[in-house]
Amino acid sequence: QKGLDYACQQGVAVLQKELEKIRIPDVSGKFKLRPFGKGHYNFHSLVVRSFQLPNPQIRLQPNVGLRVSISNANVRIGGRWKARKGFIKVRGKFDLSVEGVSISADLKLGSVPASGRATVTCSSCSSNINRARLRSQASWGGWLKLFHKRIESSLRNTMNSKICQVLTSSVSSKLQPYVETLPLKERLDSVAGIDYSLVAPPRATADSLDMQLKGEFYNVARPSPPPFMPPPMAIPSLHDRMIYLAISDYLFNTAALVYQQAGAFGLTLRDDMIPKESKSRLTTKFLGKALPQVAKMFPNMNVQLTLSVSSPPHLTTRPTGIALTAAVDLQAFAILPNSSLASLFLLGLKLNTSAKIGTKADKLVGELTLGRLILELKHSNIGSFPVQLLQALMDYVLSAVVLPKVNEKLQRGLPLPMPRKVQLYDLVLQPHQDFLLLGANVQHG
């Protein structure tokens, strides 16, 4: 309800401005002035000076969407009037106070199946005006007593019909375009985009408004459905924040699939990429401390490590935390004097990392920390050797060089599916089984 109240506050501010733009047509008619017969009056230059909406509310309307209700609204209308009977002409200014205005409207929420875009329409609207009071600013105000009831009734009926017209129009011309700022498909880089389209119409219940988004990465050049399905999510019922966003492991794992298939996880390391202060070096001399045959066969040469991810990394979220596993092939080469490469060995690396996910500027950001690293010798051109001899070097290379580069990219952030100008604050992130739950308050501006 806190989120609905804030949305109500923002929406009613827009509606108020639109209602104050109502154009009221001139009102003309005849009146009787005994014993002199009939006269004519005309009310013109009518302007809505203020339209106050003091008690707005938005409530959930199950199976429809939202119900907007406003009570005790009041309107001030100003203008000019003139009356004539024979050679007698009078004119002046007037104020009309319209009080006790009540408005009720249902906003039906839906979606366009072909695009997954959210829609909102005004499915019903009614308004009622309790009373209208006419006051003249001229010394001829007594003339108004001859026809004030007709004017009050006419202007009350006019305002009654205009209110729902304006509300319905505002929903289609203001609210719907704003809803359309919810991102559908957003290209992130030359490789991937993210699909946030709706997979079903929004669903209103007695205590929540739920939207199911696809939450899937896709290859911008060759989009294709992933070979796995999203896991079910048992989302807890929480009400401390305005909105809650459940982010399934499916989102992150489709990202891993797309980037791995595009070859974006490849990385080449050379000695000049190792921190200068480090004792560990990518040279045959340093490698020869663990593998003497390397230094003998390729003396005083630099070493190149080429890393490629052999299968998509897999992220798993549990209440205890977030883990990511990856299988990496590491090919080691000696760089010969003519800059050609001589293959040394091929290792298979199984990485177990812990992941921290946070937020920055309305984006999800991540950071990986190396946990356990398991080595396997897949092929060797320098003879067989125990892979444990390279454990310390590989731990260092992964922790000091590879993961910092990965984390640098993860800090660029993943945009959250928020409409335009919505900012999040008071964020809280909770890991659950197979999904991450983000709770936040929102502000517009």
From Swiss-Prot:
Signal peptide: none annotated. Restricted to cells of the myeloid series. CDD domains: BPI1, BPI2. One of its GO terms (biological process) is lipopolysaccharide-mediated signaling pathway. GO terms for cellular component: extracellular space; membrane. Residues 184-248 are annotated as: Central sheet, part 2. Residues 249-419 are annotated as: C-terminal barrel. Residues 198-203 are annotated as: Cleavage sites for elastase. InterPro entries: Bactericidal_perm-incr_a/b_dom (IPR017943), BPI/LBP (IPR030675), BPI/LBP/Plunc (IPR032942), Lipid-bd_serum_glycop_C (IPR001124), Lipid-bd_serum_glycop_N (IPR017942). The N-terminal region may be exposed to the interior of the granule, whereas the C-terminal portion may be embedded in the membrane. During phagocytosis and degranulation, proteases may be released and activated and cleave BPI at the junction of the N- and C-terminal portions of the molecule, providing controlled release of the N-terminal antibacterial fragment when bacteria are ingested. The N- and C-terminal barrels adopt an identical fold despite having only 13% of conserved residues. Belongs to the BPI/LBP/Plunc superfamily. BPI/LBP family. This is Bactericidal permeability-increasing protein. The gene is BPI.
